[in-house]
A protein has these predicted regions:
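Nucleotide-activated sugar donor-binding and catalytic core shared by glycosyltransferases
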Residues: 1-164
Length: 164
């Protein structure tokens, strides 16, 4: 087996109650950060339902999975922050909200697609055991982020120039 922890970060704080209900139905130990209690060392799942901590919490991640990217969900959340801090990215095929970004990250080697839950599980297990692959994906993510930094300003400049 592998020694791992899961950090759940709901995009919307109001989802915390739904997530807590689901956590209570499964056997793993979990902790809710907003309860302001010390996190037990043996906790398996951390529910990050607090504000302003995402950047600090994700600094220690070895892998990131992009939410809302596997069936039955569609759209996907942003993988940009994970790439910027060098976290290897896994995502489902339903990245319609970030289609070009997702494709570019996969092409750069910073991310991998998982077509379903079984493939996601296999990729997580493979990458958990392969520090060289994680390191390569991490560097690819940081490189991708650096290469794309300032792209909004460049696009805006191009649009404004075309309007003149």
């Amino acid at each position: 087996g592998i020694d791992c922890r899961l950090l759940l970060v709901p995009r919307h704080a109001e989802r915390a109650l739904e997530i807590i209900r689901l956590l209570k139905q499964q056997p793993l130990t979990w902790h809710q950060r907003s309860q302001n209690t010390a996190t037990p060392n043996s906790v398996s799942i951390q529910l990050a339902d607090t504000t302003g901590e995402l950047a600090r919490l994700t600094q220690v991640a070895d892998l990131a999975f992009v939410g809302k990217s596997l069936e039955p969900n569609i759209g996907g959340q942003t993988p940009i922050e994970a790439a910027g801090i060098g976290i290897p990215i896994l995502m489902g095929p339903n990245m319609t909200n970030f289609k070009a970004v997702a494709k570019s990250l996969v092409h750069s080697g910073a991310a991998l697609y998982a077509n379903d839950e079984n493939q996601l599980k296999a990729l997580v297990l493979d990458l958990a055991k392969d520090s060289k692959a994680r390191a390569a994906m991490s560097q690819a993510g940081r490189d991708w982020h650096a290469d794309n930094k300032g792209s909004s300003a460049r696009i805006a400049h191009t649009i404004l120039a075309a309007l003149d």
